[in-house]
Structures are given as C-alpha cells and as structure tokens.
Amino acid sequence: MFRKALMASLAFCTQIGVASDNAFPSTYQPLASEPTVIRNATILTGDGKRLDNADLYFDEGRIVWVGSGEAADNSRVIDAEGRWVTPGIIDVHSHLGVYPSPDVDAHSDGNEATAPVTAEVWAEHSVWPQDPGFSRALAGGITSLQILPGSANLFGGRSVTLKNVPAGTYQAMKFPSAPYGLKMACGENPKRVYGRRKTAPSTRMGNVAGYRSSWIKAQRYIDDWSEYERKITEQEATDTGAEGNAALAAALNKPPKRDLELETLAGVLKGDIIVHMHCYRADEMVTIMDMADEFGYQVGTFHHGVEAYKIADQLAQNGVCGALWADWWGFKMEAYDGIQENIALVDRPEGGCAIVHSDSDEGIQRLNQEAAKAMARGRAAGLTIPEERAIGWITSNAAKSLGVADKTGTLVPHMMADVVIWNQNPFSVYAKADQVFIDGAQVYDRFDVRLQPISDFELGQLIEVAP
C-alpha cells in the first residue's frame, strides 16, 4: 500500500506541464440549443466546397448534414434564400480582453515587458471578459479567437483560445481541449525594447542567441525530469521490502525544481504547445525555421509576415501557416516590403496555409472584408481564387493554426455547429452577419436586440435617442 502511494506521487510529479495544463480549467458549457435547419442558402463549407440553394442541419451543438437530408419534426426552420452561410469566423491574432476598451493605461495588460523571456505568463490571466470588443466581434461573425500576449519579448507567454460567448470569467469562454500557444517575437520589437535599456537583446543576433539559450535550458529541464523518473522507476523495479521503500521515498523527495517558464518551453519541445511567432522579414522566418529544426520543434504560424510571399514555398514545405494582414505595412522598417498579394501568394503552393488575422479590435469586426481585399488583389494578379477557397483563410486554416481543426472551422458532419448566416456574399463590402450560432445556440441576431449581447461594463451607459 505504501509503495502504491509512492508511485502515485511519482505519476503526479513526473508529468512536466500536466499540473499547469490542468490549472485554470475550462468551464465552458454550450448554451441551450434546438435542432435547426437552414434552407435554400449558398453555403461555403470551409473545406473548399460551395453548395448553391442548399440546406444545413445541426442538432445538439453539432453539424448533422449539409446539402440535403432529413431533419427532426420539431426543428426550427430558417429560410435563407438569397443569403450565404459559412463556418464561424476565427481570428488567430487578437488582444481583446488583455488590451480592452476603454483604452486606458489601467487596461494595458498584454505585455509583461520586464524581461526578454517571460514564457511563464499566461494571457488568460489578463483577459477581462467584460471587454465590449467581444460583442462587437460577435456581430462580425467571430465565433472563436486566440488571445495572445504582446510582442515586446522574445518569449511573451502562453496564448489562449476562446469561444466568443458572453461570460463572467475567461474560464467560461475557454475553448475546451484547445492546445495552448506560445507567443514569440523576432525582429525590431524585442531588440528595441531591451536595447533602449542597454541590456540584451539589442540586435537581431542577440534575439537569436536569447531563443537558443532558452531552448537549451528547456531541454535540460526535460532531461532532468526524465532522469528523475528513470531513477524512480528503476528503484521501484529492483528494491522491495522496507529498505526498498525507504530508498524509493528518499528518491521521491529530490525532484527537480518546478519552473513555470521552462514548463511552457518544455511543452513546445514535447509538441504540446503551438508556437505563434511575430515575424516580418523573410530571412528571419527562415532563421527561425532552422532554429526549430535544431531543437526539434515545429513552428505553427508566423504572424504578420509582410514578406511571407518571398518564401511561400518554404513555408508550405515546412508546414508553417502565415497569419497575415490584407494591406497593412510600412509602419516600421521591417514592415516596409509588403504587397497586397501576400496572402494569395502564401496560399498558392500545395500545402500553403494562408490566414487573414486582425491584430486589431476594429479589424476583427470586419475580418470577412479583410479576406475580401486579399482575394481581390490575388484575382487582380491573375490567380484563380473562388470564394469557397478564400473563406478558408478565416475558418479552416485558422482552426488548423490553433490546433482545433478537428472541432471547428468547417461545416461537415460531427463538427461544432459554429455557423454564420450572412445577408449576402460575405466578401461584399455590404455583407453583414444576420445570425450567429456557437455550438448550435444562436448568440447573435442583427434584427433582435435580445440577441445582441452587451458587456456588463456597458450596462446603464447606452442611451437610446428618440427618432
């Protein structure tokens, strides 16, 4: 019995990161929903298909079928003739909640700019669920979003993926079982922030040295815990009786010291945490991919990447997504060499993973229009980009980037019923989200104020003006 208790302690102690990942668990519960069939719509499924004059049926929070089929007799029926239906829109780069509205110093909680390596901080611990930006984004069809720390540091901390539902806590918004991300930054930001303080890094080579030193420490941390587990397992297998129990207990009393920073970095090296890297220049992105090869981890997504078009083939070959702006560049030197065809060119190679992101509390409200701009510029350059492909830039590719493509981002059977009904083609400047569903529950209606959530912070502040 004593020995079993010791081994239970071992199981708890030796799983690096498990304690962290189980901390602050998601309490998200889908809202009540009803079986719903949407009739006669133009449907963009998110996986490359377009269905005209088609139907969509979901029940118990999941897509049941798309195209045609049988629905329950008690189903709610929505006639969407002349309208378009897409998966819920996903923004992979948002700071809602960590830089909430109103924009005052007291709300500046996105950058722990006190050291170049702050992998120990978690963005969710700064999220203010009352940020009015969440409901504004919902009105634009945003059903899921990743909240990231800022880009002042080499390692900025963990990101979190949220369901865009009204809630009093971030835990109640937390996307169930979505993997954590790690925000990293290359280029001007870290070297500017710390170079001004006359400390490292102050150059790009200092940036890279800082990453590599941290990865070495993380690998040593993994090795220390693995060696600890090996010794305990060996002790348990070879020793018996009171003397063996004493030796086992002594070994258990000497675990490596727990380190929150290194737990996060170790999570990346073990493949449990996805790297999201702020990076603009093509040469730097290639350097980062080489470094990932050196330490045996995968870069998930480069964010911003205004020069990603220069290395589109390499990104595709390495399985790296590019989360990009449609037409935002030139605001600093490393952002100088941007082109409006960037997204379309990153999307072009086989295996290319282009994403339209916002990094803006305003842009997130019109992410469909940002995708439309990128599609238009690609078409003008002679590329064939139908709507059914471009919609993936803000749905299925975004879900892939966040590690939730098996749960949301497409309208196929068994996926979460995250759905938007648009008044017309979502790539039109006149498009508006009429109705939004998350896990099959209607959470927004353009024509019903009862389904237009507002933040608790705004209650009592909105004044109706008589016509």
Question: What are the residue ranges of the model-derived segments?
Answer:
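C-terminal cap of metal-dependent C-N hydrolases
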Residues: 41-44, 400, 412-456
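Polyanionic/metal-chelating signatures
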Residues: 133, 138-303, 432, 438, ...
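Histidine-rich, glycine-flanked metal-binding segment
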Residues: 21-34, 43, 47-86, 103
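Bacterial N-terminal signal peptides
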Residues: 4-15
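Divalent metal-coordination and catalytic microenvironments
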Residues: 41, 56, 61, 82, ...
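His/Asp/Glu-enriched, well-ordered alpha-helical/loop segment
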Residues: 27, 32, 101-102, 108-114, ...
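Extracellular/periplasmic ectodomains of large secreted or surface enzymes and adhesion receptors
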Residues: 20-33, 435-467
